[in-house]
Structures are given as structure tokens and as C-alpha cells.
Amino acid sequence: MSRPLSDQDKRKQISVRGLAGVENVSDLKKNFNRHLHFTLVKDRNVATPRDYYFALAHTVRDHLVDRWIRTQQHYYAKDPKRIYYLSLELYMGRTLQNTMVNLALENACDEATYQLGLDMEELEEIEEDAGLGNGGLGRLAACFLDSMATLGLAAYGYGIRYEFGIFNQKICGGWQMEEADDWLRYGNPWEKARPEFTLPVHFYGRVEHTSQGAKWVDTQVVLAMPYDTPVPGYRNNVVNTMRLWSAKAPPYFNLKDFNVGGYIQAVLDRNLAENISRVLYPNDKFFEGKELRLKQEYFVVAATLQDIIRRFKSSKFGCRDPVRTNFDAFPDKVAIQLNDTHPSLAIPELIRILVDLERLDWDKAWDVTVKTCAYTNHTVLPEALERWPVHLMETLLPRHLQIIYEINQRFLNRVAAAFPGDVDRLRRMSLVEEGAVKRINMAHLCIAGSHAVNGVARIHSEILKKTIFKDFYELEPHKFQNKTNGITPRRWLVLCNPGLAEVIAERIGEEYISDLDQLRKLLSYLDDQAFIRDVAKVKQENKLKFSAYLETEYKVHINPNSLFDVQVKRIHEYKRQLLNCLHIITLYNRIKREPNRFMVPRTIMIGGKAAPGYHMAKMIIKLITAIGDVVNHDPAVGDRFRVIFLENYRVSLAEKVIPAADLSEQISTAGTEASGTGNMKFMLNGALTIGTMDGANVEMAEEAGEDNFFIFGMRVEDVERLDQRGYNAQEYYDRIPELRQIIEQLSSGFFSPKQPDLFKDIVNMVMHHDRFKVFADYEEYIKCQDKVSELYKNPREWTRMVIRNIATSGKFSSDRTIAQYAREIWGLEPSRQRLPAPDEKI
């Protein structure tokens, strides 16, 4: 007779291996049905399209969850070094289709929904974008998480679960209006709340110094509750975690008020604590010293570091008891990557934990912190650099200010020893800036407290070393690296452009999807007529599809055979949407001058959001829409030319417009765009680039060959020389008749007859204080655009150039970027090894 099973043996039956996997269309249909009825509690008589989307999302999520659990089991068994990517922005977009692509479920789900009388594409369109970012910074973080999972790295993305993401943009009467992005109003099927890991975060209070050391006391506490979202790698059974923190008031919040009849007010006051995770600040290129923003930055850092240390101390899966108490191995097991300066408080916070709570001495705590942290810089614009007022830090985070002062003193002692007698250097390198308002320079804090500092394109990294961080480079040159940005080919080719992905796979197989350098094999097809024809056909199909979308969404009819000329990015003076406007007006004026002259038909599309408080950016949007009103309604223009402003540009719209674009506008003033990643997405999807030698454009032109790029304008050195000489817009105005005509039109109200002085601020800016020197590049830009039109007349040569660009875009995979971070900053070797599937033994 067999002995009775122990409780431990019985529990072994609770295993992910015991669950049947979803492997075929029949299983998918059953699970869809089960979720519709049992999870959503609906039947087909009352189910809405959104219910069907949720049922499909839950069905696909089932396929993720077993892999997610197994991945975490694997990490706890192997105890690898873990990567923690801290970012205040994580611009994920939609999840359903990306998950199906990475798990190889797309065809089966398509067939299952078809058999159920549903259209999968329509269901995909119901999903809200997770718009937890302003633009490139947050989208880069999302691409990086995808690549870290694909490369088998034990990585975690940490950020804030903003209740309201980047605002929805509405264009009313040509003006941008902002609407709240209530992306969670229907719920989010991809996240899992983890209330058991809720952590306290402290603010305000004061510091007591005792014989045992410093104590931060009398603080206000806010709780950080984590929500986990799975991040699947590409077909390797790895599913990593993105953990977003939501602010909650503690149950005893303002309890003292209860005794004096203030119960209702105390409950209402809970909102004040919970405001921390309420909304994303919609501005990442102008620093605003808002207390709530500083609270957000510390909130994510404090919760994340507690989580990291808990995980470091416990090495067994599910074990909450500390196993490690010694921090010598911390930098060997933990890498913290700071995505810009927003999470820079991780440096003083880690020191606070190690010194005040774990009782390490300062030198040991500093050594551990520096070896653990690394910093990525994303901007050279001085107005974007974070410089927090000391008085704000003193009130909100008094202990951290003391620690920053201590870091600064010790750091400046090192500088003084390395450069004796150079007093001005001490002033320039100090973490504390003296002035009318004393400030903490967060970039300086990051450089001092990290073992690696990287820019995000080769030219950007050189600018950092030669200009804004020159003093720091001279002190510690070994810290400075370059890591050129990249994009995930899963979302930015396979998902958004399946036709092109298939045409490529027919020639070189599918391995390129996780090894993008293999695209170079396409160079041998440059003269293959069938391949040229297939690439051109896919582009035309994408253009027809996007034209139909514009007609449905915007009620705008465009010519799908026209050249699709696209500039989509945040609206900012340095990105020079104004230069694009000057070209549009030039084309219009030429048509009016010579109405019978042949012109290559163009549809010029501009999209992007302006920060709500950025007056000039909002005026630029108004100008674009005003020009469109004139051009699109002028019978002399006809079908040759259209100007469209793409409202509410976001990840899901990018996935539609980028595959349809013929020409990608990357026209920032040389030396201002750190890298750019939109440029890479267009290149991979078969658009040619017109651009300046700025950011990653330089490396893209190098890869493709400058002959296969429409390069124009000043180089960085030219801009520097012009700055020294003094830029004078009047010179260009006097010398160039076409430019003069445009400025006269803007000044006289040609594009705003009801309000002739509407664009006076734009005219005043470009004529008298244009930091980004639009006029200086105008002539070359117009000539370069003429070359674009000339080449477009020759479809075969155009497509050959497109193929050359696609074939040489492999360098710009985020897999390459992350492999470099892993080897050169985190001290890890990426792995292409596939984890066992859930029904296999680990």
C-alpha cells in the first residue's frame, strides 16, 4: 500500500507543467469562449467588440503567463546578474499584436477569430495605446525591454503606472487642444496587480543625527503598489517583467483628523498622495521645477531600490526571508541603468539605504553605488537638463540633500587634487550650482555616481565629451562610451509591415528578425527585377491602405500615387518643422507662378504633439494647418499636392504611417538631436531619408553610403563657426527671393486673412532670435528636395536605393544596442538560448 502523500508532495501537483498549453486553433477558440463567458461574464447577445477584444487578449495572455512564471523560476534557479532599467517614461503602445508576433500565435489567432465570425484587425484597433511617454525616450525604453527579453537577459523595466498618459491631441480650428488620456478606463488585461509587494515611500520630515548615524524621521508616507506587465522575447520562451508603481495613500493617512470629525476630509485628502502617479508630465525638452515631478522621480526610485534589495537578499523563488546580508556581491548581481537624469535620485537613495539602514561605511557604500549605476544621456539642449532648486530638495528630501552635499564635497576634493589651482573648474563641475536660486545639477550627480556614461549616437557622444561634459571627460575619460540607439525589428517591421517582412523572408529566411545584420544579404538582390517589383508593390499596398485610413479617420482624400513625404515627431523648434513649412510654401508659390509646369505629386504629412505650455510649438501646428487650408483648397494645385497634419500622433499611428512613407524628414539643426529613432524606423520600412548630419543620421548615411541618402545643410562644425561669426537671418532674407516672399506672406496674413498678424511671433523668431538657424539651411534643403523629386520620377532607381537602405539598416536593431550595453556596461554576455517551453522540464 502506497504511503500517503505529504503536503509538500501534494503541492507539487500545483505546477505550470500540469497545464495544457494553447497550441492550435481549436484550443484558442475554446479559451476565447471560456474567457468571454467566465472572465467577462458576457454572452454573444450582449458582448460588444471591446468584450471580444478582451476575450482575445486574455486568451493570448494565457499563453504568456506560463512562460512568464517559468522564466522567473529559471532566474531564481540560475541567480544571474539582473538588469534594472529605470525610466520615468515607458511608451509601450499596444500589446496584443506584439505578443502574438513574439509568441508565433498570429496566424492561429487570425484563423480562430475568423472561424468565430470576427475580424482580428478590428479587434486589435480597439486596444488603447499605453502612452506612458512623450516620444523617443519612452519608446526607446520599450524597444530595449523587447530586446533584453529576446537576448535572454534577466531584465526588469521599472517606471510609473500613470493613470493618464500623454494627452490625446485634438485639432480644433487648426489649434492643438489637449484631452486627458484615460487609457485605463476599461481596464488593462495585460497587467497584474501585486499588492503583496506594496512598499512605503517617504517624503518631507527631518534628519536626526545620533551616535548610530543619521535617521530620517517625521516623514509623510505614500505607498507604492506594483503592477506587473509581461514582456515576451522573440520566440525564445523568455518573458521578462515591466513593473510599474501606482501611488496609494496608507490606511492611516491623516488619521489624527478622524478624532476631530474630519473623517470625510481625511478620506478626500488621500487623493493628494495618489496624485503622484496620476499623470505623465507632457514635456521632456524643457525642465520645469515642479514639486510633483520631483515626487514622481523619487517615488519610482525609492520603491524600485527597495524591490531590488529585497530580490538581491532573497535568492530562492517565493522566499521573502533575507538570505544575503553582505553587499560585496551587489554590483556583481545588480546593474541599474538610469534612462536620462529623471531617475538620478537612485544614487543618493542607494547610499542612504546602504549607510543609514544597512550600516555600511561611506567609502564602501560609494564603491557599491558607483559600480552598480550607469547613466544614459539623451539631450544636449541646456534648457532640458534637470537642475532642482535646493530649497525644494531640502523640504521634500532633506536626507538626500545632505548626501548630495557629501558626494559633492568628496568629488570636488578629487577634482582639486587632479587639477590643482583650477578654481573655475571646481565651479563648473560642482553638483551644486550657486546663483540667485541654488540648484542641484542632476547630470553632474549622475556622472559622479556612475561607472559608465553613454550618449546615444556617435556624434552625440563626441559632443558630450567636447562640450557639456568636457570637464568630466578630462577627469574620468574611461567612464564615457557611445551606445547608438536602435529599434526592435519585431514591432517596427514584422508587426507593422508584414508584407515587407514576408518579401524579405522569401529571399533570406526568417533568421534576420532576431539577427538584423542578415539584411545585408539583400544587397545581392539589388538588380533582381522580381525583388525590386515585390518591394515596390508592398510599398504601394501600404500607401493604398494608409490612404484609405486617412479617408476614414480624417475625411481627407489623397493621391496614393503621390510621393508620401512624412515628418512625424514631437513639435519642437530644434526639430525644424518650420523648415518643412518653408519648403511647402516654396512648392505652392512655384505652382502659382507656373501652373502648367510638371510637378512630381506630393502628399506632405506632418504629425506630432506640442507640450501644452510651449507657445512656439503650438504656433507651428497652427501654421501647418493654415498652410494646409490654403494649399488643399486651391484649384490651381489640384491633385498634385496635399498638406496633412496627422492628429494625435502615437505609437499605433506610427505603425500605420511609417510603412507607407516614401520620404523621411530628419532635418534638425546639426548638433541638436541626440540620436533619433524614428529615422531608423523609416529606413527599415523602405523610406529614403532627407536629413542633416545630426544624431544617428550620420551613422545611417555611413551604413547606406552617402549617395543613398539625401544629405543637406550645415555640419556641426559649420554651426559652431556660424555661432562664432554671429548668425544673421536678415542676410538670407535679403539674398534669397523665394525666402523673402514666404516671410512677406506670413507677415501680411496670406495664410491667415482673418487675422493678418497671427504669425507675427513666428516671423519675429525666425528673423531675430532663431537658435536653430532655419534660414541657414533653406537653400540647400530646397535643392535637395528637388533631387528627391527627380529620383522619384525613376521608380526602378528609387526602389534600388530603398533596397540598399533596408539592407544596411541592420546596425540599428535594438538587439545590437542592448548586446553592447550588456557586454560593455553591465558585464554580461547576451544569450540566444531558448528556454524550455512550459510543458518541458527546466
Swiss-Prot record:
Gene3D superfamilies assigned to the protein according to its UniProt record, in alphabetical order: Glycogen Phosphorylase B
Site positions (Involved in the association of subunits): C109, C143
Positions contributing to AMP binding: D43, Y76, R310, R311, F312, K313, S314, S315, K316, F317, G318, C319
Required cofactor(s): pyridoxal 5'-phosphate
Record site feature (May be involved in allosteric control), residues: Y156
PROSITE patterns hit by this protein: PHOSPHORYLASE
Residues modified to Phosphotyrosine: Y204, Y227, Y473
GO cellular component terms, A-Z: cytoplasm; sarcoplasmic reticulum
Pfam families in alphabetical order: Phosphorylase
Post-translational modification summary for this protein: Phosphorylation of Ser-15 converts phosphorylase B (unphosphorylated) to phosphorylase A.
Role played: Allosteric enzyme that catalyzes the rate-limiting step in glycogen catabolism, the phosphorolytic cleavage of glycogen to produce glucose-1-phosphate, and plays a central role in maintaining cellular and organismal glucose homeostasis.
Similarity section: Belongs to the glycogen phosphorylase family.
NCBIfam families named in the record: P_ylase (TIGR02093)
Name the UniProt record assigns to this protein: Glycogen phosphorylase, muscle form
